């Protein structure tokens, strides 16, 4: 998976945390059997910046821990003009699944509040956002069970246990 990580924090995110994000998302991509040419980005920021994004795009006037913006393929306008290509060429074109924004302030706050490691909380949030990019949600109780179990399975298999 082609993963771009952008650090927009003021103090800079330690390399070991950037590497953890890279590793856990690569692991999650393999766990879900995504194509090797799948693309996505993660932007690391502070509470102030994620608050602004949350307010602008979701209409919620507060900071949050993680926001995902999936790039969806069900665009009706695009469906009116189908692109026809052979399977070999189609396999070479990367699929961008979207972008994740993570508040590093919230990672620290929530790890402290929940009593687990900073690394566990960071892994939890990026996998949570990653699953949203891949069509999972928790709006309905049954969907929540599926998503949260998959999230726990990925984190446990990777080694980020509670």
UniProtKB/Swiss-Prot annotation:
Record-listed Zn(2+) binding positions: 128, 132, 138
GO biological process, any: rRNA processing
Enzyme class at the top of the EC tree: hydrolase
Required cofactor names: Zn(2+)
EC number assigned by the record: 3.1.-.-
Localization of this protein: Cytoplasm
Organism superkingdom: Bacteria
Keywords attached to this entry: Cytoplasm, Endonuclease, Hydrolase, Metal-binding, Nuclease, Ribosome biogenesis, rRNA processing, Zinc
GO molecular function, one term: RNA endonuclease activity
Cofactor binding notes: Binds 1 zinc ion.
Transmembrane segments: none
InterPro entries tied to this protein: MetalPrtase_cat_dom_sf_prd, YbeY, YbeY_CS
Gene Ontology, cellular component aspect: cytoplasm
Gene3D superfamilies to which the protein is assigned, alphabetical: Metalloproteases ('zincins'), catalytic domain
SUPFAM superfamilies, A to Z: Metalloproteases ('zincins'), catalytic domain
Function according to Swiss-Prot or TrEMBL: Single strand-specific metallo-endoribonuclease involved in late-stage 70S ribosome quality control and in maturation of the 3' terminus of the 16S rRNA.
Family matches, as HAMAP family: Endoribonucl_YbeY (MF_00009)
Family under the similarity heading: Belongs to the endoribonuclease YbeY family.
NCBIfam families: rRNA maturation RNase YbeY
Protein name: Endoribonuclease YbeY
Organism: Levilactobacillus brevis (strain ATCC 367 / BCRC 12310 / CIP 105137 / JCM 1170 / LMG 11437 / NCIMB 947 / NCTC 947) (Lactobacillus brevis)
Lineage: Bacteria, Bacillati, Bacillota, Bacilli, Lactobacillales
